Amino acid sequence: MYTVMLDLKGRSVLVVGGGTIATRRIKGFLQEGAAITVVAPTVSAEINEWEAKGQLRVKRKKVGEEDLLNVFFIVVATNDQAVNKFVKQHIKNDQLVNMASSFSDGNIQIPAQFSRGRLSLAISTDGASPLLTKRIKEDLSSNYDESYTQYTQFLYECRVLIHRLNVSKSRKHELLTEIIDDQYRLSLVKQREFLQQIEKYK
């Protein structure tokens, strides 16, 4: 498996199923600004709320071939083997498909993941052990705490500024290397001092 990150903003996403797994997947898709359609006879209370707010569309029925047309990303989150088989038989080769109940039946896996601002971390054991995946996620989320939210934004702003400086490539590299020292994550004062230092190069 090759790990990539998808930009789902404005992209069509079809979620087949309306239970716990579907709800969890949808929550992430909403954060990414996807255009979501849910197809399921019944859906969770959260999905009902999102529909009421106009955040997604719900078709309360069994999935049909017409629902799969012109969809960028399909997530099948149901334990109904007949539904899973139907979707597998009718998808197109160029569609991205995640089968929650059987990784091998789709061409996309959705790893455990979390974000701290511009920092995104994803963990997968390729289906070997969801429990180990969960443990590693908990360990990483503890090590990479909320301080990284502000820190990664600082790094991004500095990178933009440094690349605009009229200095040598080696000096730019030195500056970029300097700010990944943990002292900058832990001190807003150090961050301000560095930005003031950058101003002197202009």
From Swiss-Prot:
Cited SUPFAM superfamilies: NAD(P)-binding Rossmann-fold domains, Siroheme synthase middle domains-like
Annotated pathway: Cofactor biosynthesis; adenosylcobalamin biosynthesis; sirohydrochlorin from precorrin-2: step 1/1; Porphyrin-containing compound metabolism; siroheme biosynthesis; sirohydrochlorin from precorrin-2: step 1/1
User: What protein does this entry describe?
Assistant: Precorrin-2 dehydrogenase
Subunit and partners:
Homodimer.
Top EC class, one word: oxidoreductase
Q: PANTHER family, alphabetically?
A: SIROHEME BIOSYNTHESIS PROTEIN MET8 (PTHR35330:SF1)
Instruction: Tell me what reaction this enzyme catalyses.
Output: precorrin-2 + NAD(+) = sirohydrochlorin + NADH + 2 H(+)
What is this protein's function? Answer: Catalyzes the dehydrogenation of precorrin-2 to form sirohydrochlorin which is used as a precursor in both siroheme biosynthesis and in the anaerobic branch of adenosylcobalamin biosynthesis. It is unable to oxidize precorrin-3.
Q: Name one GO biological process term.
A: cobalamin biosynthetic process
Q: Which family, according to the similarity comment?
A: Belongs to the precorrin-2 dehydrogenase / sirohydrochlorin ferrochelatase family.
Effect of substituting N98A: 4-fold decrease in the dehydrogenase activity
- Quote the gene name from the UniProt entry: sirC
Q: Does the keyword Oxidoreductase apply?
A: yes
**One MF annotation (Gene Ontology) recorded for this entry:** ferrochelatase activity
Q: Which UniProt keywords apply?
A: Cobalamin biosynthesis, NAD, Oxidoreductase, Porphyrin biosynthesis
Q: Where does NAD(+) bind?
A: T20, I21, P41, T42
| EC number assigned by the record | 1.3.1.76
